[in-house]
């Protein structure tokens, strides 16, 4: 049992080209050969009275489910992937037959005749134009196949695994050079896997993950201050790596099979904190590739598919995060050539934000800020955003400093860009503070802003994602709602201390140390008063205490930090789903509507833990 680490709820098994979301013994989603795909099938155990315990296999991203009938163990299922190919394998050992219901939105074709007695097989065709998320769709015909050992059987839509040993292999067909070879590659890879030594594949899988864990570079002396530190490092590394695509983009959890800007930055920081520079580099390369392919940056982008997800004001906030990723990788590695080769991308990210400056302020993005979470009204989307403006100033300043240091831009160009940045910086305190109050928005921006007559986003009337028209009042309605309801612009100011912490995490805070400390102490008191969310009936975001802990470590002296260890304990206590974190918590527990096993929350919480432990470590 020492090599088996208990996990709760949903977890992921994946290698960048195939992924499976698993809960107990149930397969709740599986997809290949890329990550911007809908779930192809589910497989759910029919006997509801059986007990299933799930474990991650220490030293790898493999999982085992143990199935019991009362006190009697009746079987084990071990899930793992091929190290690189779009192949997932489930090995099954049972003392009696066990039945699972197979369901799929795509009609599975019986291909038993192709393999004769070598396998029970079902082929899935996912048509070009299938929805991935919202309006984002696949752009290629995709084939996947489920292969079962010949001693399995299928009856009336159920798969029966027999007593003894059996297996399930799920294969995705790579698209090939021209995007048209999925069927041929699915069939050839299926044939190859039926002849493969599955024990050898498992050994290669374990060796692959040992290599990843060996590459992790953290201060283990500092981490020794908490129990099971290695387990934590492994768990978060697995959560990030299994949800990072072969292209470099990262899904935002089981619900969202696209790569989102804000989420990508959190994961990037997690990789950097772990010393895993290669996946961090691939993330930046991926986003640069999206820009060079499209000429703009969508709100979220496909991985292995050209689809994208659009929202309002996609040229702000996320562009600040992307520029920070490029700079932080360059600063950490000293690879100036990496930045030099991507100056077209970097300049685009800078100028996209500059074009949105009004009175020194950048507006909100429609999906990556407080608006998407319902914390701030969407009708105020074109207000000045404190967080987006801070990101612009911080990222632009660092970029222009690098351009001057490494002679990446002419002095005249640097001067022109710097004038805009410094003007925004000079106005920041006036724009977003009033006495001791820090505001997340400033309505004055809209008085001079030239908002578009049409935009794509969320209707202020029916909340549908579609194309919108600006109303005489200044809000936005879809053609169906236009003229039937009003859409006034929200004109109040909002204050919440939580808005400060993301810009602080990104190294872009423009507030004084004293103001930061005052806000921190208010936040600390609130968290302790509601017992770290246990008495909070509303949602608490899953990264809240991690980002607070990170800010505490950044603002306070090491001698003062031990007084805030309760925040560290609260973060560790919140771990679920594979010893990582979920999207939202309510009354101290994961919210029912929360996306589980989240890369963003897990990465930020790990950054907070590492920053705190490094700051309090008294060793060499």
Tell where the protein language model's regions lie, with residue ranges.
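Catalytic cores of carbohydrate-active enzymes
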Residues: 297-300, 358-365, 381-385, 391-518, ...
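Structural helix-adjacent loops and short alpha-helical linkers that scaffold large soluble proteins
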Residues: 218-230, 271-284, 329-347, 400-422, ...
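Active/binding-pocket-proximal capping segment
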Residues: 283-290, 518-528, 557-588
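Active-site acid/base region of carbohydrate-active enzymes
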Residues: 215-235, 287, 292-296, 327-387, ...
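Conserved oxyanion/phosphate-binding beta-strand-loop segments in alpha/beta enzyme cores
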Residues: 57, 211-253
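Terminal accessory carbohydrate-recognition/targeting modules of carbohydrate-active enzymes
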Residues: 1-223, 262-263, 273-274, 554-558, ...
């Amino acid at each position: 049992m020492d090599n088996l680490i208990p996990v709760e709820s949903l977890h992921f098994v994946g290698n960048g080209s195939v992924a499976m979301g698993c809960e107990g013994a149930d397969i709740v989603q599986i997809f290949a050969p890329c990550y911007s795909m809908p779930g192809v099938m589910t497989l759910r155990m029919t006997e509801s009275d059986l007990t299933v315990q799930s474990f991650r296999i220490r030293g790898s991203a493999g999982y085992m489910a143990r199935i019991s009938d009362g006190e009697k163990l009746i079987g084990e299922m071990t899930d793992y992937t091929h190290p690189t190919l779009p192949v997932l394998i489930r090995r099954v050992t049972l003392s009696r037959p066990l039945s699972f219901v197979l369901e799929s939105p795509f009609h599975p074709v019986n291909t038993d005749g192709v393999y004769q007695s070598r396998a029970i097989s079902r082929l899935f065709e996912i048509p070009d134009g299938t929805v991935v998320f919202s309006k984002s769709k696949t752009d290629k015909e995709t084939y996947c196949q489920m292969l079962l050992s010949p001693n399995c059987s299928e009856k009336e839509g159920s798969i029966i695994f027999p007593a003894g040993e059996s297996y399930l292999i799920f294969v995705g067909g790579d698209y090939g050079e021209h995007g048209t070879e999925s069927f041929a590659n699915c069939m050839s890879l299926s044939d190859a896997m039926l002849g493969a030594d599955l024990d050898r594949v498992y050994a290669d899988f374990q060796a692959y993950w040992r290599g990843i864990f060996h590459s992790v570079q953290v201060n283990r002396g500092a981490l020794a201050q908490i129990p099971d530190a290695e387990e934590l490092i492994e768990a978060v590394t697995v959560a990030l790596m299994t949800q990072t695509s072969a292209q470099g983009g990262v899904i935002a959890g089981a619900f969202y099979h696209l790569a989102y800007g804000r989420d990508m930055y959190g994961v990037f920081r997690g990789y950097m904190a772990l010393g895993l520079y290669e996946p961090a580099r691939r993330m930046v390369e991926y986003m640069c590739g999206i820009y060079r392919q499209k000429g703009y940056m969508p709100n979220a982008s496909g991985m292995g598919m050209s689809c994208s997800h659009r929202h309002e004001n996609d040229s702000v906030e996320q562009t600040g995060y992307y520029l920070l990723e490029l700079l932080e990788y360059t600063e950490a590695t000293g690879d100036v050539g990496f930045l030099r080769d991507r100056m077209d991308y970097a300049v685009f990210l800078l100028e996209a934000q500059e074009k949105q400056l009004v009175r020194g302020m950048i507006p909100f993005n429609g999906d990556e800020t407080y608006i998407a979470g319902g914390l701030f009204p969407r009708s105020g989307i074109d207000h000045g955003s404190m967080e987006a403006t801070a990101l612009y100033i911080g990222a632009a300043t660092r970029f222009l400093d690098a351009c001057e240091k490494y002679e990446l831009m002419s002095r005249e160009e640097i001067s022109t860009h710097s004038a805009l940045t410094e003007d925004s910086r000079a106005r920041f305190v006036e724009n977003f503070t009033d006495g001791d109050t820090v505001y997340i928005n400033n309505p004055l921006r809209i008085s001079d802003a030239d908002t578009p007559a049409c935009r794509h986003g969320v209707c202020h009337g029916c909340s549908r994602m579609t194309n919108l028209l600006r109303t005489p009042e200044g809000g936005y309605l879809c053609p169906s709602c236009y003229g039937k309801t009003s859409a006034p612009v929200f004109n109040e100011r909002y204050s919440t201390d939580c808005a400060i912490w993301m810009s602080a995490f990104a190294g872009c805070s423009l507030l004084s140390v004293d103001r930061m400390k005052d806000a921190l102490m208010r936040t600390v008191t609130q968290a302790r008063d509601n017992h770290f969310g246990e008495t909070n009936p509303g949602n608490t975001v899953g990264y809240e205490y991690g980002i607070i802990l990170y800010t505490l470590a950044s603002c306070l002296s090491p001698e003062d930090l031990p007084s805030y260890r309760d925040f560290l304990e609260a973060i560790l206590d919140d771990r679920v789903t594979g010893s990582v974190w979920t999207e939202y918590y309510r009354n101290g527990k994961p919210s029912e509507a929360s996306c589980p096993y989240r890369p963003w929350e897990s990465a930020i919480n790990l950054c907070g833990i590492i920053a705190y432990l490094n700051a309090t470590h008294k060793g060499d």
